[in-house]
């Protein structure tokens, strides 16, 4: 066990496009989507210990410890590996909840990767991803740490290298439950599947966007505002919307115009997760 206190990034992601191709008998939807990380991150400061207990600080308002994906991920890893070690995890939270940028899934993946290292379990990324999918369909993306084209219910991953653009994100003052979007009767569920090359060359679309804009006026308003300046879309099932730019200056210029009552961020697209780089740095320092 490595007892040194370590600090780990937990990055957000964007769905650059999202197509819904059908629905399985079990209710899960068949998707085609392109994930890319952005340099907007929560951070987790983790100290492994011999207590056998998982403790978190500070509490997240409205979330019980046993419902927190960070705690769930650590406990799941303990149980799977029969590890008797514990950990104290401090959370620096900046990613908005219910935003469609993967904050909870990313937190879970960061815990799996970090504790696998600190507890010296030596589990493969495939094993960690298999554990992670029990916590959320997006967790494997964050475990593997590369931008990816995903199919199936999101579990079939193929590395991809979309342009690393600059983005302006706006988080409307609403939280959207994924299940509410995917169960909406008017959701498009029959977009034909296409090869990745064709999708990459086409105009990017999110099949959830029309429904979300119709049900949540706040999302429609903010997305309409962004569309005045640049190509813009919903990410995931929302609520975050984003506009894309070729340069940081272009993004900064539009960001400076965001209405005072809106919560916004500037971020850079990344095809390799900062979590990967942090892990390699700690391995080098500890000569593992």
UniProtKB/Swiss-Prot annotation:
GO MF, one example: ATP binding
The protein's Enzyme Commission number: 2.7.1.148
Keywords tagged on the record: ATP-binding, Isoprene biosynthesis, Kinase, Nucleotide-binding, Transferase
Domain of life according to the entry: Bacteria
UniProt-annotated binding residues for ATP: 96-106
Pfam families linked: GHMP_kinases_C (PF08544), GHMP_kinases_N (PF00288)
Pathway involvement of the protein, from the record: Isoprenoid biosynthesis; isopentenyl diphosphate biosynthesis via DXP pathway; isopentenyl diphosphate from 1-deoxy-D-xylulose 5-phosphate: step 3/6
InterPro entries, per database record: GHMP_kinase_C_dom, GHMP_kinase_C_sf, GHMP_kinase_N_dom, IspE, Ribosomal_Su5_D2-typ_SF, Ribsml_uS5_D2-typ_fold_subgr
Catalytic activity entry: 4-CDP-2-C-methyl-D-erythritol + ATP = 4-CDP-2-C-methyl-D-erythritol 2-phosphate + ADP + H(+)
GO biological process: isopentenyl diphosphate biosynthetic process, methylerythritol 4-phosphate pathway; terpenoid biosynthetic process
Active-site residue numbers: 13, 138
UniProt xrefs under SUPFAM superfamilies: GHMP Kinase, C-terminal domain, Ribosomal protein S5 domain 2-like
UniProt-listed NCBIfam families: ispE
Family note: Belongs to the GHMP kinase family. IspE subfamily.
Role, per record: Catalyzes the phosphorylation of the position 2 hydroxy group of 4-diphosphocytidyl-2C-methyl-D-erythritol.
Name of this chain's protein: 4-diphosphocytidyl-2-C-methyl-D-erythritol kinase
Organism phylogeny: Bacteria, Pseudomonadati, Pseudomonadota, Gammaproteobacteria, Vibrionales
